Design a protein with these regions (language model features):
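Glycine-rich tight-turn/loop motif centered on a GG-T
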Residues: 17, 21, 31-38, 69-84, ...
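Flexible, glycine/charged-enriched surface loops at secondary-structure junctions
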Residues: 98-106, 203-216, 246-253
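C-terminal domain-boundary segment and adjacent tail
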Residues: 139, 231-257
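Conserved, mostly hydrophobic/aromatic
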Residues: 8, 62, 108, 222
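Catalytic beta/alpha-barrel core
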Residues: 33-38, 117, 136-145
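Glycine/small-residue-rich loop that forms an oxyanion/phosphate-binding "nest" at active or ligand-binding sites
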Residues: 68-107
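Active-site rim beta-loop-alpha module in soluble metabolic enzymes
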Residues: 146-204, 212-213
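Acidic (Asp/Glu)-rich catalytic clusters
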Residues: 22-26, 47-60, 99-101
Length: 257
């Protein structure tokens, strides 16, 4: 069984360090690269693409609202044409840099508030899906499993990779437990690796209550903001491999080839 590990990278900003990015690129199969609107710059994009190419990691754009002051985490209401321009412009920024390295952007995953809003708002999800489809009909749309973006992408017969979050607990409705709650995050590496393996093997969300919600799972999103989360990410990868899972970049998975 194939599975992918992805991570948001190149997010250099006052909120986020990129010092762990080179190490993360030894763990992940696909990189979601900040395109300068919430974080990152030309130098960070070049760095992440260069290491990704060397490590066989597939390259993805991680577009956001143009809101570096809030790391793209503030909700902003824009028109459909403004959202489309937002997505297309950031894809083109990263694609032009990728081409200098003889690489291509092969997936897109929205960031922060844009992603969160589109998980619940079908009109916004439709707009994002259409924008992504307009830049390249072969591009993979990386979406949270069970989200409105998954529904929107299926309507357009897009290539869809559904992701779960390795370090987050889920509510019984399939949504992430709010960060305001004590049990939102999973910080114990042993619990995290079992949590991920169970969901991947069962193709179901493993809710905090114990409820299972059947869903499609193609990718696991990890984070590496500190040494503890780096260790958790490595533990998750090793546990997947030792249990017979085959790790692949998104664009190399049989589902998309």
């Amino acid at each position: 069984m194939e599975i992918n590990i992805n991570c948001d990278l190149g997010e250099k900003s006052k909120f986020h360090s990129i010092e762990n990015d080179p190490e993360l690129l030894n763990i992940v199969n696909s990189a979601n690269i900040a395109c300068g609107y919430h974080a990152g710059d030309v130098d960070t994009m070049n760095m992440v693409i260069k290491i990704s190419k060397s490590n066989g990691v597939s390259i993805g754009a991680h577009p956001s609202f143009n809101d570096p002051e809030n790391f793209g985490r503030k909700k902003i209401n824009l028109s459909a044409s403004e959202i489309t321009k937002l997505i297309v412009d950031q894809y083109e920024i990263l694609q032009k840099i990728a081409e200098k390295h003889k690489e291509n952007v092969t997936h897109i995953k929205p960031h922060g508030a844009l992603n969160n809003m589109a998980c619940e708002d079908i009109e916004l999800a439709n707009t994002i899906a259409k924008a992504i489809n307009s830049v390249d009909k072969n591009i993979i749309f990386l979406v949270p499993t069970g989200s409105k973006m998954e529904i929107a992408a299926k309507k357009l017969n897009m290539k869809i990779a559904c992701e779960i979050f390795a370090d987050r607990n889920y509510e019984d409705d399939g949504n992430l437990v709010s960060r305001a709650k004590d049990h939102a995050l999973i910080t114990d590496p042993e619990i995290a690796k079992k949590h991920v393996l169970s969901m991947v093997k069962n193709q179901a969300l493993n809710c905090f209550s114990g409820k299972l919600i059947p869903c499609e799972i193609d990718s696991v999103c990890i984070h590496g903001d500190n040494q503890s989360s780096l260790a958790t990410a490595q533990s998750i990868k090793e546990n997947l491999l030792s249990n017979g899972l085959i790790l692949k970049p998104l664009n190399k998975m049989k589902k998309f080839s």
